[in-house]
Amino acid sequence: MSNFSKISVANDPRTELHDSLGLTGAEISINHLPAGGSVPFVHHHKTNEEIYIILSGRGKAVVDGEDVELTTGDIIRIAPDGKRQFFAAADSEISYACIQVKAGSLGAYTADDALIEE
């Protein structure tokens, strides 16, 4: 068994990576909305926060009724209770990664969790 997983992602509207990468601590999806498109529902989560990384394009998130403009390179974190919906700009598609993890579950990270090989 290998210590890594690698896949390539097509330009599909949504690709969930938990099964294809064997994820055990997070859900990651890659999402594409055409110009003028939107996620067709408002949602929030029971326990998971979401981190959205805008890979290309422009659009907005509506979080608890507030418009948040988004463009390439922006990153937005939304708490579990935040009611959210995503929209592409009328003249631009948008592509983004969504990382979903249980809020409050991060026990160690980066240098605190790394074991440096000699």
Question: What do the predicted segments below correspond to?
Answer:
Residues 1-26, 35, 107-118:
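A short, N-terminal "cap"/entry segment at the start of jelly-roll beta-barrel domains
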Residues 18-20, 40-45, 87-89, 108-109:
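Short histidine-centered beta-strand/loop micro-motifs
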Residues 24, 62-66:
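Short strand-coil-strand connectors
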Residues 29, 38-41:
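Short, charged beta-strand/loop "edge" motif centered at a coil->beta-strand transition
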Residues 32-33, 44-62:
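Short, conserved beta-strand element in jelly-roll/cupin
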Residues 38-39, 60, 76, 81-86:
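Histidine-centered metal-chelating micro-motifs
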Residues 65-81:
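Short acidic-glycine-tyrosine-enriched beta hairpin
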Residues 80-106:
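Ligand-binding loop in jelly-roll beta-barrel domains
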